[in-house]
């Protein structure tokens, strides 16, 4: 058998092996997550938040200076799966998944939301991953903002713990429209961590943010998957 005949056979075998590995790992992850008592895990929210802030997001603590971080989440602008794939959502930014290139209304960069007291801080980043804009929404603006749940469909429906929401933040000009999830992910392309414990941690932190936001502002309250 010639080498030219062996090459496609080897490729097929390797591809099949990789596909089986990914499928098996995803199945194991789903089983662990589905069997997790998230109400009990929620008691670990503070520990999980401190761990992520220290290991993955120290720049948020630097930006907040002396202000306390009560809760945090990731955010993105509305972005279709096809567009995101075209822009290659593959890289990592400070240990987290990125979203592409420019700001709110065109191509995307990662955004971070931090709840501190009654204020909500929005951090936007440049193409180098550095924070280049810091907006603060006070109580008055948040009382006139909106948060609505995104209907689940297709693959996202299977990831019910990572429910998406549209967040419309009031400004002096037009509202800033963002998408946030009940999990530390930037977009609806599957970015959920492959490690089951990291997945549990990401879900708890995302839900903690939504719970604290809803507790402060009833107009920004949505149903939380881990309490349903």
Residue ranges and their predicted role:
Residues 24-113:
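Anionic N-terminal interaction surfaces
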Residues 3-17, 170-228:
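Terminal and domain-flanking low-complexity segments
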Residues 96-164, 175, 184:
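Phosphoinositide-binding peripheral membrane targeting modules
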Residues 166-168:
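Beta-strand secondary-structure signal
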Residues 14-27:
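Cytosolic-side junction of a single-pass transmembrane alpha-helix
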């Amino acid at each position: 058998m010639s080498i030219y005949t062996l090459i496609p056979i080897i490729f097929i075998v390797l591809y099949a092996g990789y596909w089986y590995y990914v499928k098996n790992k995803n199945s194991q992850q789903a089983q662990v997550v589905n069997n997790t008592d998230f109400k009990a895990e929620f008691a670990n929210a503070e520990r999980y938040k401190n761990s992520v802030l220290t290991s993955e997001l120290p720049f948020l603590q630097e930006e907040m200076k002396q202000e306390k971080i009560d809760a945090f989440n990731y955010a993105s602008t509305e972005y279709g799966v096809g567009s995101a794939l075209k822009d290659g959502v593959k890289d990592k930014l400070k240990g987290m998944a990125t979203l592409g290139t420019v700001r709110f209304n065109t191509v995307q960069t990662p955004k971070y939301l931090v709840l501190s007291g009654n204020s909500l801080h929005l951090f936007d980043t440049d193409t180098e991953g550095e924070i280049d804009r810091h907006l603060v929404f006070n109580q008055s603006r948040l009382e006139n903002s909106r948060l609505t749940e995104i209907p689940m469909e297709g693959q996202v429906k299977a990831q019910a713990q990572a429910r998406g929401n549209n967040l419309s933040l009031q400004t002096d000009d037009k509202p800033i429209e963002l998408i946030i999830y009940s999990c530390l992910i930037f977009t609806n392309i599957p970015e959920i961590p492959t490690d089951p414990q990291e997945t549990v941690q990401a879900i708890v932190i995302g839900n903690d943010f939504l719970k604290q936001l809803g507790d402060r502002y009833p107009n920004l309250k949505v149903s939380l998957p881990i309490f349903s």
